[in-house]
Regions:
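OB-fold single-stranded nucleic acid-binding module
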Residues: 143-147, 240, 244-283
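Hydrophobic helix-and-loop "lid/oligomerization" segment in the mid-to-C-terminal part
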Residues: 1-143, 213
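Accessory interdomain/linker segments of ATP-dependent helicases and helicase-like nucleic-acid enzymes
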Residues: 170-230
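Beta-strand/loop nucleic-acid-binding surfaces
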Residues: 226-245
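Short amphipathic alpha-helical interface segments
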Residues: 293-295, 299-340
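A short, conserved structural fragment
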Residues: 353-364
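Long, charged amphipathic helices and adjacent flexible linkers at domain junctions
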Residues: 21-66, 152-172, 280-301
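Short, basic interhelical loop/turn and adjoining N-cap
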Residues: 337-350
Length: 365
């Protein structure tokens, strides 16, 4: 529980045990304040990490991300590690320095044992423990950089370093979505570690409408397939940040729940992941990995070189697009879709790097 991570577990227990309604309300209020404090601490650390990545974007090329800062609250670095891992799709260790001593917490992707990777560096650590998907550690602050090098050397020795996967529990025809279908999912709750919320795949959905909500903080997206229409909520994404347009055919990973309002019960569909239907995810991720290997100075195979090496025509395709568009404010990954899959993501990144070095464009990560 978040309360436990910040040392407030006693309040949580008291809330569950008390028979006094006033005391329960008071404790609940304190817990809510504590939780808001946790969120603010977490937000501040994530903002600092964002600044670090913008200043040194090359650090995200590592197979295992190791990011450290002075005085970060040790009660939330595990949560932060999970969020950074989800964003970059890589095993992540967040380390908080306290003078000469430091403590870290890590989260991994399925298929890469983080505890094995950490244990391989145990001579640098004063304490370590964990399991394949998460690990905790302590070390001297002076050893952080060496730990970063060593754990990445370990990762580079893995023959098939896994990608962060979005595991779909079932594919669903949108015509079948109903309150009666979704209701039984409640029996699977409570959700959490070891029992994640079921993810449903909706495939080849045509985007038909984009509606901003709450002063453009969120989006309601309408999709169609055959004769079926569904409304999907995309939280914390503005219309300017959403890279797709009406008419695009997309694959969605969503969660389903029941929303009750004014006596009416309806299915609530929440967007978790989205990609163009025609995008070959495996090829895309491999091309991204090829680019990272190149930036790390690793020996590349002929196939990797072919994937990355752009022609004069490739440069022209991307440059003309950027010039006509007046730049590009969306994630670089979505350029593959915007360029009609003429260029791989690895090739796009190589071209952007070259254009940036020649001062033809300015890149802001």
């Amino acid at each position: 529980m978040p309360a436990k991570r910040l040392g407030f577990s006693g309040k949580s227990v008291s809330l569950l045990l008390t028979d006094d309604e006033n005391e329960a309300m008071s404790i609940a209020k304190q817990l809510n304040e504590d939780n808001n404090e946790r969120k603010e601490i977490e937000k501040n650390i994530l903002m600092k990490i964002d600044e670090m990545v913008k200043a040194n974007p090359h650090i995200t090329n590592d197979r295992v991300l190791v990011i450290d800062g002075e005085g970060w609250h040790q009660g939330v670095i595990g949560i932060v590690a999970a969020k950074v891992k989800d964003f970059f799709g890589k095993p992540t260790v967040i380390i908080s320095r306290d003078g000469e001593e430091a403590k870290g917490s890590g989260r991994s992707v399925e298929g890469f044992s983080l505890c094995d990777a950490v244990f391989a560096c145990s001579d640098l650590l004063t304490h370590c423990g964990g399991h394949p998907m998460a690990a905790g550690l302590s070390l001297k602050s002076k050893n952080i950089e060496l730990f970063r090098q060593r754990i990445n050397e370990y990762a580079l020795k893995q023959e098939n370093m896994p990608f962060n996967a979005c595991n779909i529990d079932c594919r669903l025809n949108p015509a079948l979505i109903s309150v009666q279908l979704v209701e039984p999912l409640a029996y699977l709750a409570p959700y959490g570690a070891g029992n994640p919320t079921p993810l449903v795949g909706l495939y080849k959905m045509t985007l038909s409408q984009i509606t901003p909500l709450s002063q453009n903080k969120h989006l309601r997206l309408q999709f169609k397939r055959n004769n079926s229409t569904v409304s999907v909520m995309n939280f914390f994404t503005s219309q300017q940040e959403f890279p797709y347009k009406v008419g695009d055919v997309l694959d969605l990973a969503v969660t389903l729940d029941i929303n009750e309002f004014n006596g009416q019960r309806n299915v609530s569909i929440i967007l978790k992941e989205i990609k163009p239907s025609v995008l070959d995810t495996k090829d895309f991720l491999q091309s991204q990995r090829n680019y990272e290997d190149f930036k790390l100075g690793l020996n590349l195979t002929n196939a990797q070189i072919t994937d990355l090496l752009p022609t004069r025509e490739d440069f022209a395709i991307l440059y003309v697009f950027l010039r006509k568009s007046g730049g590009y404010a969306y994630p670089i990954e979505t350029l593959v879709h915007k360029l009609d899959y003429k260029l791989s993501i690895g090739k796009i990144r190589i071209i952007l790097d070259a254009m940036s070095e020649l001062s033809l464009i300015e890149m802001i990560e």
